[in-house]
Amino acid sequence: MTTSVDKLNKLIEEVNNQDELQLIEEINLYIKTLYELRQVKIDQLSNIIHQLNQQIITSNKEINQLNKINDYNYELINVNNFNFVSQQSFQFTNFDRSSSSSSESTNNIFQMINKRLNELDNLKVVIVKELTDLETNLNNLKYKQNNLHESMEDINDKLDKLLNDMDKSGIMEQDPSILRINLFRNLGIKLENMPPNANSGGGGDSNSNSSNNNNTEEDCVIITDDNNNVNILNIEPKLSDYFISNYIWDKL
């Protein structure tokens, strides 16, 4: 195929053999041919550019559609779905669809997802801290439970010992009043016999001042509290067991 340079060389060789008019016609024909070839090439490139622009527009529409917040992806990031999270302990960003539709900065679902992921990471830190606090509280409760269990076992042992002592002494077969007296004695209450006039001038209970004309001894209950205060109650026939029991419990 003859190139442009070859054609020019050929023209130069024929300059002397042809007249000027023929030479001009050949040059014009050559220029026209080059122009047509160039125009065809430009049309081809213009067509390619148009096709690429259409592809760009289509791709942008697809990207915008992906970024757009629809019903499905909005529900995925909606904070109202996180029912296990207390709103008081952790605050999520509330993505409002109506407001996001008017704002380009919040109308990108991927930006919203990234923001929600950051919030979830922060929530994970909060949950780990709360779990640590719960484990600490649980360990403290277990420690208190063990102490209470040991105390309960100690009380049960003392109660079993008391019941065994009562059973060995035959107290269980005695009168209920005697059982109460033995119980009071085990609680540190002293039961003594004393003449009625022994406490007539003392500072005991008013019932201790009750007079008795005979010189026989009466049963007395001497109650000592934690402050070593002594209270004396004369056990008289007119006093019921209920009164005596309540009196003793009040003084303990």
From Swiss-Prot:
Residues 206-217 have a biased composition (Low complexity). Keywords: Cell cycle, Cell division, Centromere, Chromosome, Coiled coil, Kinetochore, Mitosis, Nucleus. Residues 41-71, 115-170 form a coiled coil. Residues 194-217 are annotated as: Disordered. The gene is SPC24. The keyword Transmembrane helix does not apply. It comes from the Eukaryota. It holds the Pfam family Spc24. It is found in: Nucleus; Chromosome, Centromere, Kinetochore. Component of the NDC80 complex, which consists of NDC80, NUF2, SPC24 and SPC25. This is Probable kinetochore protein SPC24. Acts as a component of the essential kinetochore-associated NDC80 complex, which is required for chromosome segregation and spindle checkpoint activity. The keyword Nucleus applies. Belongs to the SPC24 family.
